[in-house]
């Protein structure tokens, strides 16, 4: 049986914490779709196509590209999972706040399409990193290179 997982997120921008979760998921499943999804509750810094391109480059640069596909969707996440035959969502969880936010969605996803959600704890080195923190530091001219892949750091430092 070919096991497919989806790692969804806004990835605005992709961080080293995201790459850690993606890499670990790629070791656990045969195929991993890293899915850039539109979050109506967030104001995007980067267009979706640019986020997918940054994911592709970051995954390639990290040397973990073998069984990983970067894509995007604006529809219902479980519909994407059904379309590709995935039964698992993988989410990184940094704190109780993330657990409280993700748990109701995990329950609904299981109800809608029998898609399970697996939570991965962060590497301690990345536990404090979030895309919103990166955006804030970058907007104030700070160095984000310790928190993001080189492609993202280059883009944000040139903006």
Swiss-Prot record:
Its domain of life reads Bacteria
- UniProtKB keywords: ATP-binding, Coenzyme A biosynthesis, Cytoplasm, Magnesium, Nucleotide-binding, Nucleotidyltransferase, Transferase
Q: Which reaction does it catalyse?
A: (R)-4'-phosphopantetheine + ATP + H(+) = 3'-dephospho-CoA + diphosphate
Which residues take part in binding ATP?
A: 10-11, 18, 92-94, 102, 126-132
What EC number(s) does the entry state? 2.7.7.3
Gene Ontology CC annotations of this record: cytoplasm
Q: Which cofactor does it need?
A: Mg(2+)
Q: Its biological function?
A: Reversibly transfers an adenylyl group from ATP to 4'-phosphopantetheine, yielding dephospho-CoA (dPCoA) and pyrophosphate.
This chain belongs to which protein, by name?
Answer: Phosphopantetheine adenylyltransferase
Annotated organism of origin: Leifsonia xyli subsp. xyli (strain CTCB07)
